[in-house]
Amino acid sequence: MDYKEEQKQELEVLESIYPDELRIINDEYPKIKFEVAIKLELDTGDSTSVLTKEHTIIAEFKLPENYPDEPCLISLEAQEVALNDNEEDNEEDEDEVEYDDHGNKVLKKFENLPDLISFKGYLPELTVQLESQIETDMLLGMQMCFALISSIKERCEQWYSEQLNKLEKQYELEAQEREKKEQAKFHGTKVTRESYLEWRSKFRQELKLDERDQVRRMKAHHGKLTGKQMFEQGVVGTGDEYMEEDDASVDDVAKGLAKTEIANQ
């Protein structure tokens, strides 16, 4: 196989297919090197979100001396270009990022989900997939750059759709959780007899209501305990002492009545 001629022919074919996207870095064999700007056609599906960025994958190809019997070397780079003047809005949104109790970013209602997707993290995985494809599809021995360029575009667009779907599901779950928390504010704790008595006991202890009631009763009885209070508090000699006091009171009354009768005579 004439490797030089094979590579020259493939480069000419690619120039005709990608007249605006292809840029030749070196066209001298055996160090042919070029890059292709692959514009992705992304779709938000049924989502109400809109695309505010244009995503392009820059694929750089280096052709070894024995290409295509040896695989080409591929380097990938992701580029993002704003479609509208949204840069100032995006900067303001960054200041309003919120996180949950576990440190995960919370998706807000006003947040545009497609803007959260970046291809930079996917490119290492994509590079491995392309290397595997060369072997799986048995591309060695034939011109493979066009097939790989097409695969890059297809895989990236598929990956984007999957990521957007995940974000939408995550947003729905978070929206449901927020709704539950909002609804919980309007539902108080169910009160049972046991919970009420427990609350009442703590409440009276905190405000010392029982002590206040006791002081109030003492004042009502001129500082003396009632018989019930003395019995409950275990005052010693309650019965005998009060019996003696009662007997003394009866004697005093009797003496008073006797004096009154003598005086009247």
UniProtKB/Swiss-Prot annotation:
Keywords: Repressor, Stress response
Matches recorded under Pfam families: RWD
Organism taxonomic ancestry: Eukaryota, Fungi, Dikarya, Ascomycota, Saccharomycotina
Role, per record: Acts as a negative regulator of the GCN2 kinase activity by disrupting the GCN1-GCN2 interaction in amino acid-starved cells.
GO biological process: cellular response to amino acid starvation; cytoplasmic translation; negative regulation of protein phosphorylation; negative regulation of protein-containing complex assembly; positive regulation of cellular response to amino acid starvation
Membrane-spanning parts: none
Other remarks on this protein: Present with 10300 molecules/cell in log phase SD medium.
InterPro entries reported for this sequence: GIR2-like, RWD_dom, UBQ-conjugating_enzyme/RWD
Organism, scientific name: Saccharomyces cerevisiae (strain ATCC 204508 / S288c) (Baker's yeast)
PROSITE patterns: RWD
UniProt family annotation: Belongs to the RWDD1/GIR2 family.
Name of the molecule in the record: Protein GIR2
Self-association state and partner proteins as the record states: Interacts with GCN1; this interaction prevents the interaction of GCN1 with GCN2 protein kinase and GCN2 activation in amino acid-starved cells. Interacts with RBG1. Associates with ribosomes; the association occurs in a GCN1-dependent manner.
GO CC, alphabetical: cytoplasm
Residues annotated as domain RWD: 9-159
